[in-house]
């Protein structure tokens, strides 16, 4: 039967068309039995006794792997091994792996084609781009040696799970050697030395917990919806490398997209729209203002309405991206995708070595959070915010100056008001419900909750900012009169007087005293809430006391209470069996009315504070808000993805869970941006975006449906991410987490530029931005370490210190930061090591997370294999080249620019540290 070739160009691991996976004919295929979320099939290759076309030539061998579907008989080029030089018996370190959702069956045929590469540096493009039945074009400089094929079922059912196949020439005649195919199951021990292939294979599930063997339940079906809601389109690679004692270790490399790339930005933009609409409504409800302030308000509202419309348009466009989980580097300048992180992926390395526990290492790779569409002509957020604040403080203008801290405080108090007022009202209603049931125990419980929430409500207004804001609003009223709706319970007279025109206010760091303004009037209004609560407490105490006396009495007179309030006593004696509801209802109404009065005044005054920030340099202020929202959205999407992955892989680690709710998690970002040209602005954006992640907290809840996507709540000053877990998993969590305790993160950023632009910055420019960022974030790491050592249990700390010398690592990191050495990449290595030892979440970022990021994560993976898993020292460079040439990161490049070349040239690479240079033949000019 003729085999038709799938026409492809620059392809990697890709899926057959749906029609092939679901054949229209009713032919039944035999599925491969596997564990959930595990690759369906993995095997490794070796050749023996290859015959060279020319007798004196040493072969440089590569194997191309293709898939032949059993019905369509179409051939799909799938992957290839690395090139092994100078031997007729090549043993390949790069294996072949088929992901869990790849349409492969026992009837599927695998074709293996062996080539001799004559000019390795020019063999840049994977063999999959070549026509299957034709000799390679002359410019590729490689020749066909032989091919063989087998059915998947033959390998699975083979006695030793090993096939030894004869390699034949294209006409099927001459035998040119043998190729051995060995089935691999991660978790098995591969016996024997590294100079030959072994076939002793037994079944075992792979580990999914960092540095420990995964519990069985972690791979169970209850977690499938959880992980499938986060990860998409996995790319898997398989390697085997020798250890220092000549044993084999197996490594599975996986790269997955995340649906959170689009889900989190959409959630966040929806919250921004809701918050901004609420703020605009609050501005409208400020009441009468003098002409100057009223004009400013109208101008602000006009611009803010335009912002809301723009956010709504962006959300509409993003909502059209249904099912999207990836934004390519070539799309980083698209306006409709501004809020979406660039090239976000989970990069995972799973290691099984003969003498150590299975281990898992995760890094989130993502483009540096930055506003690419906005551009970097005037710098990034760090510079723009500083300049904006300096101008507000030092330039004369007709507004009232509030510091960023006071503005943030105003937003915080407004948020507390919006949260606490409905809570107090709810608990007040519950108190009335308990009263109607005439249940003393229920009444006491309801009163306790009402008291707690009301005290929090009252405490929120203690800040001096509220007082100064009330006076500021007073001066902004027509004629300087503070006008307010009448209070139902507390009546006060407002003195009116003429005041100087507000146009005369200039560069005021505080509100001037106004002789006609009654500062104590606010205290009286505010105190009425507490007094109302005290009346309710006293009434409840009397009702319960009276009820207790009635229970003890057999119908006689109640005992005398000389200290009782006469009014309350009259009420009690007039109701032998009191109607508690009727007696408490008026007091509850009073409490609610007093609260409404306080809320009305406070919200108006604090909204006036926010008006000052918006009114000054209005377009610039809103553009800064937009830019900050964009950068934060990109950073938040990556953080949520990293948190969920870390949580999933550590669910059965008691130490991690205790650290999570006791201390929180450190989140370490490795930046590779230069401090030159546009990348300075990107780094300035990134620094602010990562710092803003401190206002994010996580809460874990039990999933009540199959929808386990995280839910975002809050406003710009504070966000809570609700992470849902399946019921069986949720029940195993510590009580503090199950009760909804907020879980905090400590984001830190260390940046070291490594490219040719950084060379220019170091010799002719300025690297102070990088130095400042590294020093500031080192202090944050020290702070986290101190909290960690203080709050974690002594027995845990004792064991932790035995296993890790964190203090030595921190001292070394500090010395390297102070050294001011050019391209000191040891800063990044030390920061990454500290993060891993502290159970943190690792990120690696460059401009687009494609080229420099690929060099960094592959170097990190091989360094871990060397330092933690005894990778043979002679194989370090070869392992590094394997991962960079044939691993997941070259697939990432292909996904982004449709070309399998890292975007470096020879001159650029001369400026790179040697360990960050890709192997020859994998880089060059790419048509993106």
From Swiss-Prot:
A biological process term (GO) from this entry: phosphatidylinositol dephosphorylation
pH dependence of this protein's activity: Optimum pH is 7-8.
Q: Which reaction does it catalyse?
A: a 1,2-diacyl-sn-glycero-3-phospho-(1D-myo-inositol-3,4-bisphosphate) + H2O = a 1,2-diacyl-sn-glycero-3-phospho-(1D-myo-inositol-3-phosphate) + phosphate; 1D-myo-inositol 3,4-bisphosphate + H2O = 1D-myo-inositol 3-phosphate + phosphate; 1D-myo-inositol 1,3,4-trisphosphate + H2O = 1D-myo-inositol 1,3-bisphosphate + phosphate
Q: Which keywords fit this entry according to its UniProt record? A: Hydrolase, Lipid metabolism
Similarity comment: Belongs to the inositol 3,4-bisphosphate 4-phosphatase family.
- Biased amino acid composition, Basic and acidic residues: 1-13, 506-516, 548-563
Q: In which pathway does it act?
A: Signal transduction; phosphatidylinositol signaling pathway
Q: From which domain of life does this come? A: Eukaryota
Q: What does this protein do?
A: Catalyzes the hydrolysis of the 4-position phosphate of phosphatidylinositol 3,4-bisphosphate, inositol 1,3,4-trisphosphate and inositol 3,4-bisphosphate. Plays a role in the late stages of macropinocytosis by dephosphorylating phosphatidylinositol 3,4-bisphosphate in membrane ruffles. The lipid phosphatase activity is critical for tumor suppressor function. Antagonizes the PI3K-AKT/PKB signaling pathway by dephosphorylating phosphoinositides and thereby modulating cell cycle progression and cell survival.
Q: What is its EC number?
A: 3.1.3.66
Species name: Rattus norvegicus
How is this chain's activity regulated? Strongly inhibited by inositol hexakisphosphate.
For region Disordered, the annotated ranges are 1-23, 481-516, 548-575
Q: What GO cellular component entries does it have?
A: cytoplasm
User: Taxonomy-wise, where does this protein's organism fall, top ranks first?
Assistant: Eukaryota, Metazoa, Chordata, Craniata, Vertebrata
Stored InterPro entries: C2_dom, C2_domain_sf, INPP4
Which GO MF terms are attached to this record? Answer: inositol-1,3,4-trisphosphate 4-phosphatase activity; inositol-3,4-bisphosphate 4-phosphatase activity; lipid binding; phosphatidylinositol bisphosphate phosphatase activity; phosphatidylinositol trisphosphate phosphatase activity; phosphatidylinositol-3,4-bisphosphate 4-phosphatase activity
C2 domain ranges (all copies): 23-165
Name of this protein: Type II inositol 3,4-bisphosphate 4-phosphatase
């Amino acid at each position: 039967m003729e085999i038709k070739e799938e026409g492809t160009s620059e392809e990697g691991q890709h899926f057959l068309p749906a029609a092939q996976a679901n054949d229209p004919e009713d032919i039944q295929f035999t599925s491969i039995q596997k564990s959930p979320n595990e690759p369906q099939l993995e095997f490794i290759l070796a050749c023996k006794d290859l015959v060279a076309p020319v007798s004196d030539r040493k072969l440089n061998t590569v194997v191309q792997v293709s898939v032949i579907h059993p019905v369509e008989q179409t051939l799909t080029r799938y992957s290839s091994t690395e090139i092994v030089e100078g031997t007729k018996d090549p043993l390949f370190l790069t294996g072949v792996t088929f992901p869990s959702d790849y349409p492969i069956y026992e009837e599927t045929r695998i074709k293996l084609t062996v080539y001799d590469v004559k000019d390795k540096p020019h063999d840049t493009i994977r063999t999959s781009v070549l026509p299957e039945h034709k000799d390679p074009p002359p410019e590729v400089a490689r020749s066909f040696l032989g091919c063989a094929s087998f059915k998947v079922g033959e390998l699975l059912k083979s006695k030793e799970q090993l096939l030894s196949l004869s390699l034949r020439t294209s006409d099927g005649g001459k035998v040119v050697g043998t190729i051995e195919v060995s089935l691999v199951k991660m978790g098995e021990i591969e016996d024997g030395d590294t100079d030959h292939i072994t076939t002793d294979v037994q079944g075992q599930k792979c580990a999914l917990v960092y540095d420990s063997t995964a519990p069985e339940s972690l791979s169970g079906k209850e977690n499938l919806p959880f992980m499938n809601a986060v990860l998409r389109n996995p790319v898997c690679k398989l390697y085997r490398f020798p250890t220092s004692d000549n044993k084999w270790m197996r490594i599975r490399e996986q790269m997955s997209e995340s649906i959170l790339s689009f889900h989190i930005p959409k959630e966040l933009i929806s919250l921004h729209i809701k918050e901004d609409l609420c703020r605009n409504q609050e501005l409208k409800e400020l009441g009468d203002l003098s002409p100057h302030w009223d004009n400013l308000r109208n101008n602000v509202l006009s611009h803010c309405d335009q912002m809301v419309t723009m956010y709504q348009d962006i959300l509409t466009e993003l909502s059209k991206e249904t099912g999207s989980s990836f934004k390519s580097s070539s799309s980083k300048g698209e306006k409709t995708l501004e809020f979406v992180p660039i090239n976000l992926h989970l990069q995972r390395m799973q290691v099984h070595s003969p003498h150590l526990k299975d281990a898992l290492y995760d890094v989130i790779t993502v483009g540096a959070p930055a506003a690419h569409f906005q551009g970097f002509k005037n710098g990034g957020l760090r510079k723009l915010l500083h300049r904006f604040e300096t101008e507000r403080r030092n330039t004369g203008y007709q507004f009232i100056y509030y510091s960023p801290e006071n503005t943030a405080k105003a937003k915080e108090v407004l948020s507390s008001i919006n949260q606490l007022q409905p809570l107090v009202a709810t608990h007040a209603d519950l108190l009335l419900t308990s009263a109607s049931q005439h249940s003393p125990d229920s009444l006491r419980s309801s009163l306790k909750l009402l008291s707690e929430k009301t005290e929090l409500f009252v405490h929120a207004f203690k800040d001096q900012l509220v007082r100064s804001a009330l006076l500021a609003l007073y001066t902004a009223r027509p004629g300087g009169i503070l006008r307010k709706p009448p209070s139902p319970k507390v009546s006060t007279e407002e003195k009116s007087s003429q005041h100087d025109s507000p146009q005369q206010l200039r560069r005021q760091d505080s509100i001037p005293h106004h002789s006609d303004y009654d500062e104590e009037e606010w205290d009286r209004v505010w105190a009425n809430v507490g007094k109302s609560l005290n009346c309710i407490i006293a009434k409840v105490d009397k009702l319960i006391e009276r009820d207790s006396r009635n229970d003890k009495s057999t119908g006689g007179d109640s005992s005398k209470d000389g200290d009782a309030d006469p009014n309350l006593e009259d009420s009690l004696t007039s109701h032998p069996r009191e109607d508690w509801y009727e007696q408490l209802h008026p007091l509850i109404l009073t409490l609610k009315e007093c609260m409404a009065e306080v809320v009305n005044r406070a919200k108006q005054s604090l909204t006036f504070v926010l008006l000052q920030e918006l009114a000054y340099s209005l377009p610039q202020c809103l553009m800064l808000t937009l830019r900050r929202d964009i950068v934060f959205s990109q950073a938040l999407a990556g953080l949520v993805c990293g948190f969920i992955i870390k949580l999933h892989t550590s669910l059965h680690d008691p130490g991690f869970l205790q650290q999570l709710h006791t201390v929180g998690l450190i989140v370490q970002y490795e930046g590779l941006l230069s401090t030159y040209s546009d990348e300075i602005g990107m780094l300035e954006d990134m620094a602010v975006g990562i710092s803003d992640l401190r206002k994010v907290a996580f809460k874990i809840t039990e999933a009540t449906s199959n929808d386990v996507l995280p839910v975002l709540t809050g406003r710009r000053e504070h966000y809570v991410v609700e992470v849902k877990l399946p019921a069986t998993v949720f029940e195993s969590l510590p009580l503090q987490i199950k009760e909804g305790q907020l879980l905090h993160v400590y984001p830190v950023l260390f940046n070291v530029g490594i490219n040719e632009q950084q060379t220019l910055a170091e010799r002719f420019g300025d690297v102070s931005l990088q130095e400042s960022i590294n020093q500031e974030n080192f202090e944050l790491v020290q702070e986290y370490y101190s909290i960690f050592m203080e709050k974690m249990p002594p027995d845990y700390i004792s064991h932790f210190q035995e296993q890790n010398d964190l203090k030595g690592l921190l001292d070394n990191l500090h010395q390297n930061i102070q050294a001011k050495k050019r391209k000191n990449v040891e800063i990044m290595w030390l920061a990454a090591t500290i993060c891993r030892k502290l159970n943190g979440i690792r990120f690696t970022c460059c401009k687009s997370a494609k080229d420099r990021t690929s060099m960094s994560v592959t170097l990190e993976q091989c360094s871990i294999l060397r330092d933690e898993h005894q990778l043979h020292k002679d194989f370090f460079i070869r392992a590094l080249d394997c991962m960079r040439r044939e691993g997941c990161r070259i697939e990432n490049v292909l996904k982004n620019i449709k070309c399998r070349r890292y975007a470096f040239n020879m001159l650029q690479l001369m400026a790179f540290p040697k360990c960050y240079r890709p192997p020859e033949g994998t880089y060059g000019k790419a048509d993106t």
